[in-house]
């Protein structure tokens, strides 16, 4: 039987986790494989030590590792290990942490010789299809390279690199079996990793600093409301039985609360709170449109969720530069007054060093938000996330970005005898 290891790793050094969410992305892939590829035995990994042990005990035929800003170097380390332990294995990487520009994407694979394939875009079906194609060529990565593989970057037998751009997202999300309801994620009710749920995918906004601001994600698609309710209930029951101290629920949507069904889902969470005492904290990025719906969602969560209104900047020129529109501050102040009167909490966020921002305009925004009575204000430095328009070479040149690198908080560790660090690129100056 073909073995596939699916790893969405988080640094775990001295018990400190670099990411405290369950590995939902690769769990989707396993759920599809379990249904569609019965001849494949797949396992999901979140913790590096467990993956290391499994790879030494039984090196997989295929290793698939997720690539995010918090685990790229960590994934690279295990890609190299896979080739050391079993040179004929196929090593696949996927995830949003890769540049938008085709030339830089091709260069990425060239710079990482342990990788055979990079999956672009959503991998729920692309990754299982890749394994299916591999089975058809008897597991030969060389013969795999002779095929035309959509949404992938991969090596041809002659050493050249093939590039097939992402195909448009078209399949219904409910075609993906739920990794919660199928039990794929049951082993991660361990009291360390918080449950993570998607109710939809995609974003109607075009913010250039965000991966979901790109055209690939411009259509919002939904998991059925019935399925999401069942997932919430499934999680609540197991949290109560297995790890009652875990009070957190993380919702992965980019604009939770903006749609009418979100209000209904929050009502269901409120009912679960009464029955199971969970969740006590809902970590969700609330939408910046339809504030009346967002407020209703916050209210129905019995105080477990805050109104998260990340303005990023209050300067109109900056907002145009990053293709973003904010709710007017006066309207936001009215929302805040309404929420405070009901005992609800609010939080906002600014980003330092956005294109066009000046020291004066940034300080002015800080003062306005403080004066508006925000309960909590976060001030971040602009990170050049791979996969965003802001990170492209053209944008860098347009706004004369000067950037530097630093280790991301909690994203380092020692694995075997190797020290591994994951870093971020931040902007330290612009032309303003």
Regions found by a protein language model. Give the residues of each.
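N-terminal [4Fe-4S]-dependent radical SAM core
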Residues: 1-5, 11-12, 149, 153-196
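A structural motif corresponding to the C-terminal lobe/cap of the Radical SAM core domain
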Residues: 2, 60, 222, 271-432
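Short beta-strand segments
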Residues: 5-8, 44, 64-69, 93-94, ...
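Conserved N-terminal glycine/acidic-rich loop preference
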Residues: 7, 11, 20, 59-70, ...
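Glycine- and acidic-residue-enriched helix-capping/strand-helix junction motifs
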Residues: 13-26
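A general structural detector for well-ordered alpha-helical segments in enzyme core domains, enriched
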Residues: 29, 51, 74, 78-82, ...
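Glycine-rich beta-alpha loop elements in corrinoid/cobalamin-binding modules
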Residues: 32-166
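Radical SAM [4Fe-4S] cluster-binding motif and immediate context
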Residues: 174-341
């Amino acid at each position: 039987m073909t073995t596939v290891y699916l790893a969405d790793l988080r640094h775990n050094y001295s018990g400190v986790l670099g990411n405290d969410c369950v590995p939902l992305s690769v769990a989707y892939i396993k759920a599809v494989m379990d249904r569609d590829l019965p001849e494949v035995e797949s396992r999901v990994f979140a913790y590096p030590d467990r993956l290391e042990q499994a790879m030494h005990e039984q090196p997989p035929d295929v290793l698939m590792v997720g690539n995010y800003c918090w685990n790229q170097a960590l994934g690279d380390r295990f890609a190299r290990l896979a080739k050391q332990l079993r040179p004929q294995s196929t090593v696949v990487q996927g995830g949003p942490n890769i540049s938008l520009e085709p030339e830089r994407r091709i260069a990425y694979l060239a710079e990482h010789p342990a990788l055979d394939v990079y999956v672009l875009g959503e991998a729920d079906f692309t990754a299982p299809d890749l394994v299916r194609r591999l089975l058809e060529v008897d597991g030969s990565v060389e013969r795999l390279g002779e095929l035309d593989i959509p949404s992938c970057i991969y090596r041809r037998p002659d050493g050249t690199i093939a590039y097939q751009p992402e195909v448009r997202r078209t399949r219904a999300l409910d075609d993906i079996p739920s990794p919660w309801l199928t039990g794929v994620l049951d082993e991660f009710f361990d009291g360390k990793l918080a449950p993570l749920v998607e109710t939809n995918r995609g974003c109607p906004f075009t913010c250039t600093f965000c991966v979901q601001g790109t055209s690939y994600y411009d259509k919002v698609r939904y998991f059925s409301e019935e399925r999401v309710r069942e997932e919430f209930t499934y999680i609540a029951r197991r949290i109560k039985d297995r790890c009652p101290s875990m009070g957190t629920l993380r919702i992965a949507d980019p604009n939770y609360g903006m749609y009418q069904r979100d209000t209904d889902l929050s009502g269901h969470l409120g009912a679960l709170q009464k029955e199971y005492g969970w969740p006590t904290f809902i970590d969700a990025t609330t939408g910046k449109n339809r504030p009346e719906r967002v407020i209703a969602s916050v209210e129905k969560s019995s105080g477990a969720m805050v109104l998260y209104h990340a303005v990023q900047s209050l300067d109109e020129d900056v907002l145009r530069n990053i293709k973003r529109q904010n709710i007017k501050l006066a309207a936001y102040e009215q929302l805040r007054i309404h929420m405070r009167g009901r005992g609800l909490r609010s939080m906002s966020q600014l980003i330092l060093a956005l294109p066009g921002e000046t020291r004066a305009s940034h300080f002015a925004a800080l003062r306005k938000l403080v004066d508006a009575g925000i309960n909590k204000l976060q001030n971040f430095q602009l990170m050049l996330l791979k996969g965003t328009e802001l990170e492209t070479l053209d944008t860098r040149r347009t706004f004369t970005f000067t950037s530097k690198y630093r280790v991301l908080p909690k994203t380092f560790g020692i694995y075997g005898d190797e020290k591994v660090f994951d870093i971020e690129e931040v902007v330290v100056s612009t032309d303003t």
